[in-house]
Amino acid sequence: MTDNSNRQLAHIVFFDLNDDSAEARQALCEAATKYLSGHDGTVYFSVGIVGDEFTRPVNDHNYSVALHVVFENKAAHDVYQTHERHLAFIEENKANWKRVRVFDSYLA
């Protein structure tokens, strides 16, 4: 089995919202920035709304907000998952989540 312990890990989350208004999308982006940015071991953080103007056949618009976080390694990701700020983000925002999809991958 491959040792991935020192590889960067991309944590990508797609949120579908019950209230999919522009205001609700913006509120989730602001909450994500407040609670999820600046964690130890974070290499990259971004959050934003779906780009509806991208209309190629391969573009997937089945989400409202996308979160992208790259961690130095899996250990940093694991600490983030149980950090009080991450848990507060979930608790304060989950009522408006219709569906959440998480894609975690090791980077080459």
Protein language model regions, located:
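Short S/T/G/P-rich N-terminal loop/turn motif that feeds into the first structured element of a domain
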Residues: 1-64, 68, 72-79, 106-108
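Charge-dense polyanion-binding interfaces
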Residues: 92-108
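C-terminal structural segments of small proteins and small subunits
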Residues: 74-94
